[in-house]
Amino acid sequence: MLTIEDLKLKIDNNSRLLGLDIGSKRIGISICDDKRTIATPLKTVNFTNLSDFILELKKIIDVNNIKGLIIGYPINMDGSFGKSAQSINDKSKIIDKEINIPVSLWDERLSTSAAFNISSQLDVNISKRTKNIDEKAATFILQGAIDYLNN
């Protein structure tokens, strides 16, 4: 896995990226345009096991000509690393070994709550807010990373 700075060196300016918000039951997936200006939700997949998810991820990467992967890293609010961060780190290492594109972790603190709050500001009802929260969180994660990469 690469730091976000090393990922920037490995990809060119016209590279599409994927963002992942990996949960215990669902994985939110987002994608950005080839100019890396805006991230948009792509889909949410039910998580059964990592092997099946990696097969689906490889298809998404191939179909969309993806050049890099940003995975949300759930660091605790105090900056420490808990069980969730360790779980994501372990899964990310396996994903990194199985796919042929650079992978980087991105601090996802508050991504799910931010996605939920944005939905509420758009006056979306509670059931619709929670329905696609994972892919919205993945979008928030990816947007933060591409904003950083573009500066």
What feature does the model see in each segment?
Residues 1-18, 25-151:
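Phosphate- and other anionic-substrate recognition elements at nucleic-acid/protein interfaces
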